[in-house]
Amino acid sequence: MKVQISFDKPDLEKALSIAAQVAPYVDIFEVGTLLIYHHGIKAVQAFKEAFPKKIIFADCKIADRGKDAVTLFAQAGADWVTVMAGTGKDVIHTSCSTAASLNVKVMLDLLDSNSLGQSALEAKNLGVSALLLHQPYDEEETLTFLDKWDMVKGNTTLPVFISAKISRANIQEVLNSQPNGIIIDKCITNADNPAQEAQYFYELASKY
């Protein structure tokens, strides 16, 4: 199981500092949406320059202009980009085709999907490399969205990542679903000792 840490605050220097501390305990560094909004592709470039051997994931939430957007983030050093499931199939397919030509992978964000099962079923044929099931950030901290897990996992052979405001309190419930990856943010990035917290989750995930 992969561990992905999301940096989703506007302070790029602080994000890079924390990333350096947790680097031994993470498989993928995510440049979060707010970091991208604030700094643009420079945030992706900064992470790639600081951690050239790490997988860099840009949570850019592409919904239009797929070819241009993917190219922009690929040139900045992203290894993964996100495309929204609720956008048109043409946008998803174009994004995936462009990504493949640039050696970049696409994770389909199911947040705005009209039908989770249908999105999961069609994703592979559109060129998607993985799926993202997560709890919207503004919703209350519950794991009720995990009730939809079987609907997604049962309709795809692609890897599925879970992002759920993961903490020590709920990590076991998330792990019990056996996702291919977990995405963790503020419980590590806001911790007094980010490295210690990252190590805790990394060692837990390594058992699955």
Identify what each model region corresponds to.
Residues S129-Q199, L204:
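Active-site/ligand-binding-proximal alpha/beta "capping" segment
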Residues P24-D27, E49-P52, D79, A100, ...:
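Generic secondary-structure signature for well-ordered alpha-helical cores
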Residues Y37-C60, T94-D112, F145-R168, Q199-Y208:
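Alpha-helix-loop-beta-strand connector modules within alpha/beta enzyme cores
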